[in-house]
């Protein structure tokens, strides 16, 4: 595994900083109601929404945000990283679910944060998202609490399970 400030390479993946031209590929994921089921916002209905989201990701301050586009074979398959350190999250195109890509990207990101001297990573997960709960558990995250009604996503009020990984 190799990482520089702007990218992380694993056996199968390249995690790199967002580019404005990533919006269309990311919109395919962010407009998918199944992929976005447990995300903190409703699916994006317009490409302009995703363009704004990608622009924010691309222009972010690396001192407070360590966010990456995940690619496999040159194809954008999702994102993983911290939009507000130490909290991080991940989102993959559902075509790539169940193949170990999220776990591989997460392991590399954890190692990166460890090498940079971070003391912890945290995550806020919808308790219905069993796949994410399992991945976090496999990587050593420990549940630190639960709360009801923490996210308003469209018409739905969602709950949270909080996790922490000491680095």
Residue spans for each PLM region:
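Conserved catalytic-core motifs of GNAT/GCN5-like acyltransferases
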Residues: 124, 142-159
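GNAT-family acyltransferases
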Residues: 1-95, 108-112, 116, 120, ...
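Conserved acetyl-CoA-binding loop-helix of GNAT-fold acetyltransferases
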Residues: 97-115, 130-138
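Residue-level marker for beta-strand->alpha-helix junctions and adjacent short loops that shape enzyme
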Residues: 87, 128-130, 148
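Conserved active-site tyrosine of GNAT-family acetyltransferases
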Residues: 136, 141, 163
């Amino acid at each position: 595994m190799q990482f520089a400030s702007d990218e992380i390479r694993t056996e199968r993946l390249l995690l790199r900083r967002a580019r404005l031209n990533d919006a269309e590929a990311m919109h395919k994921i962010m407009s998918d109601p199944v992929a976005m089921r447990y995300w903190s916002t409703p699916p994006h209905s317009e490409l302009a929404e995703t363009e704004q989201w990608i622009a924010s990701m691309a222009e972010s301050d690396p001192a407070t945000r360590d966010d990456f586009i995940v690619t496999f074979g040159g194809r954008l398959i999702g994102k993983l990283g911290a939009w507000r350190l130490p909290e991080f999250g991940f989102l993959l195109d559902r075509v790539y679910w169940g193949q170990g890509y999220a776990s591989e990207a997460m392991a590399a990101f954890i190692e990166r944060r460890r090498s940079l001297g971070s003391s912890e990573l945290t995550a806020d997960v919808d308790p219905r998202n069993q796949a994410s709960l399992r991945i976090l558990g496999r990587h050593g995250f420990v549940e630190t609490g639960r709360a009801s009604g923490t996210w308003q996503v469209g018409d739905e009020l969602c709950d949270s399970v909080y996790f922490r990984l000491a680095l």
